[in-house]
């Protein structure tokens, strides 16, 4: 399999014990079996590392991926021109169990690092500065990302995203944790008492589309 100059890093955020360990182990097995030199698996037990609302430990994940964030770069091109200034050289594929809440938090971190590199390249922010060094820019980024995460979550699970206080404010809060409890209960209710009807409707719609 030839992927040219592209590389992939799979960021696996599932628990490394309990029922999720089996899923993570299967992913490990598949990656090892395929033995592709342009694919790397980076396991990070999100719930273990960030327990007790200590989400500053996400810096560990950032350090694990920082060299590849730089290596993969970003795409940039002149307006009305086919000339490219930069070509992206790789991708991050992030997953948890449903690729929603933990995934959204990790991807927001990756996106912020990439945004920093792009703005630094364009000399909009200085070298060595972080996006959070500019309060208005940081607030806008967090709001856009959190709103997008909430919308994706509503389509998939019927509620806003869990852990949204981190993506929206950059830290975990007790009000955010309480809101997570409400959303988790709402998801449980929908999953057991409402989503069955929706799934049947989708199945019928797909069947009609086939015929």
Q: How would you describe each model-predicted region?
A:
Residues 12-15, 45, 98, 107, ...:
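Active-site proximal loops enriched in glycine and acidic residues that flank catalytic Cys/His/Asp
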Residues 17, 29-33, 56, 60-61, ...:
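Long, compositionally biased intrinsically disordered terminal regions
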Residues 10, 104-109, 115-117:
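Classical protein tyrosine phosphatase
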Residues 90-109:
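A phosphate-binding catalytic loop at a beta-strand-loop-alpha-helix junction
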